[in-house]
Amino acid sequence: YCYICHSLKYDRWYSNRNSLCCVFLICVLTLVAIVPNLCMGTLQYDPRIYSCTFAQSVSSAYTIAVVVFHFLVPMVIVIFRYLRIWVLVLQIRWRAKPENNPRLKPQDFRNFVTMFVVFVLFAICWAPLNFIGLAVASDPASMAPRIPEWLFVA
């Protein structure tokens, strides 16, 4: 995204020093994201998957926050960035080939479909887990036991 939409600023933004700072910032943010799990006791053994995992029924507010910040916000950011890239590509293509009636070409449509498929596959893979989290957060006592075991081990 940065290389395509902000090409003039890319070299300055992604210098060696700034790249190292980004890696360090990502490590710090990862640790910050893990700390609430340790403090709230949301990491518990789940016999359905034979592993220690995030227990969605411990805190409704925390589960909702996890879904919002770890799924919904990234989805909105990805949508925004894909749209910006797509609009920029179309603007450049239309500027390069001015026509009286610019139309969407098959190649442009295929590129858009490819980007859309990647996004949809990401959403399909992660949405069920997050929507289950929201369902459990809405009523932990009754919803948690109703989640089928096969959903976690499939």
Curated annotation (Swiss-Prot):
Keyword Transmembrane on entry: yes
Residue ranges that the UniProt entry lists as topological domain Extracellular: 41-62, 137-149
Superkingdom classification of source: Eukaryota
Pfam families assigned: 7tm_1
Membrane topology: Multi-pass membrane protein
Chain ranges on the Cytoplasmic side, renumbered to this chain: 1-19, 84-115
Protein family per UniProt: Belongs to the G-protein coupled receptor 1 family.
Name of this chain's protein: Melatonin receptor type 1A
